Amino acid sequence: MEDNGAKKCLLDHISFQVDDGEMLVITGPNGGGKSTLAKVLIGIEKAESGKIFLNGEDITDYDINHRANAGIGYAFQQPPRFKGMTVQRLLALAAGREMSDQECCKLLSDVGLCAEEYLNRQIDGTLSGGEMKRIEIATVLAKEHTLCIFDEPEAGIDLWSFSMLIHKFEEIHKEKKQSLIVISHQEKIISMADRIMVIDDGKIKAEGLKEDVLPCLNGLDKCHTCAGKAGVRA
Amino acid sequence: MVELDHVVEEVLKVINDNGFSQKGAFNLRQNGTSICHGDSEHIKIKKKTDKPGIDIYIDGDTKGEKVYIPVVVSVSGMTDLVYNDFYIADGADVTIVAGCGIHNSGCNESRHDGVHTFHVGKNANVCYQEKHYGEGNGTGGRVLNPVTNIYVGENSVFNLDTAQIKGVDSTVRETLVEMDKNSRLYVTERLMTEGDQTAESNIEVRLNGEDSSAQIISRSVGKGNSVQTFHPKAVGNNKCQAHIQCDSIIMDHAEIGSIPEIRARDLNAAIIHEAAIGRINDEQLLKLRTLGLTEEEAESVIIENFLN
């Protein structure tokens, strides 16, 4: 891929599958390629080779909006601000339809915001980083997706809101049966996963069931016990 | 009730968001003539005898009432000059909905120059909304040059909300505001130009009274080869506060200039100016595209909300 004008291999031989209703947590060191992978999945970044399938449909050549309409929801790690746009308007755009005050309030409450105060707030510099992050998550929750991708949803969120967020992920995962890819360093989120994938230096270092990969996370290089079960690729 | 032709009705739909109706206090001017007008219990409209235009008297018992004074120019080649004076009594609470639309299907320039002067008493609350719009498939220019003079009395609040969204080939907007003790001013200016259109806006606010305050927000989008120039000026002649914020989105080959001027003549005057010009943020486009919008749709949503 192009990185600042130079050709670089940012992701190499990445191949994995997320089953219906499954929650995959991607973790690993900073700069290892996790966010790049998420951007490749939604179409913000293009890979030079490889294929991406969604429900058996080859979406490799789809651009961002086609992938979104095909059923991928994506929450940015650092969401952009929109001068002049209200929170309610953004949520309506995210839902793809007009939303009542009540519906918007419910969504905002789900991410830990005191809803009525925010409906007519502009998504500009008057909102804190934490508020922006929670609104960003609400934009993904505004619509049902086949696959939701969250890039470090915990960043910038206080502990109380984080607990609510965990609850929301559980709801998406267990009740709505939507597939989830969550990029995270947070232990609580990692422990919610069905499967865990560790990415470092653009490569998959480990991938497998939570119970197999979790014990190895603190010392991946030294771990031998899970190599067979989890497919550790040290 | 006067029957309006189709062109006038369509233009009025655009320049009056909530629709124009011949009820209450109103005055509709078409092609240099007042074609219908009405008074209400508290708002009286009188035709000037010495020059074209009207005097609007809003008494102190006016509470939450709206007065509509739209202008439509639908003849190609016409230059319409009008003087409208508003006398707003102490304690009045009123919304004045103005606006001008030019429909030009010919090859000659159509032009409207509206000179509006507001005399606002004490403890009044005034909201003035003005939308400018041009349409028609003629080659003749559509020109609007508004002049707005506002005198805001003690403890009064004045909201000036102006928008020029589409179809005006050339505009030079002159606004002068004089503010008395403890008065407040909120100005919101929205402007979009495209093609070879030009727009110039000069706003001067003189904060003369103690504890007066002003907030001026200007948002604009320049497309095509259009040229925009903003010259906001705040002069603090007393203990006061003023904040000017000019934001512009530049597209294509447009040119946008912002020339601020802030001047303090009192030690306790606090005046701030912020200005930014830039292209549409890529991250904003990407975010909206991840919601399923095409690039064109995303761009349009960003502009629409930015100007909202």
Which functions belong to the PLM regions below?
Chain B
Residues 1, 287, 296-297:
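Sequence-level preference for short, compositionally simple segments enriched
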Residues 26-28, 35-286, 290-293, 303-308:
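Conserved beta-strand/loop scaffold segments within soluble protein domains that form the structured core
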Residues 1-46:
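Short, Gly/Pro- and small/polar-rich lid/capping loops
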